[in-house]
Amino acid sequence: MVAARRGDRAGANEFLAEAGLVAQRLGADRNDFWTVFGPTNVGIHRASVSVELGDAGRVVEQARAIDPSRLPSLERRAHHLLDLAQGYGQWRKDHEALDALLHAERLAPQEVHQQPVVQRLVVELLYRERRTTKPRLRELATRVGVLAA
């Protein structure tokens, strides 16, 4: 993630490839000592890297290929959905972004409500608000603290 945040696409992909090999050797998703790791978690990190690099289409493609129900942690499942929401937001598919945010909120409300990235995305969606998303979006905006009740 650090490499992606620095804009180092090659470095990020190199780290992901190495993690993918280790996950493949492990063979299954594990949660030993609260350290979730395995093929699914590496897939989630691939999507996260794509979010950081602004590759919206790849985020959505990678996120759709992941079965988050294989992860024992609700927070990791929610994080995956937040990546998907950001990808849809970057792609300006606001209805899909909102659906992913609401799904993440159902899984781990405290996690979603405290994330600055969620607040920024909700503000962005409010600027582009459509009639079809307005009631649900405004309710979410209130819950995450970017719109007064």
Q: Which residues does each PLM region occupy?
A:
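Conserved binding/catalytic microenvironments
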Residues: 1-149
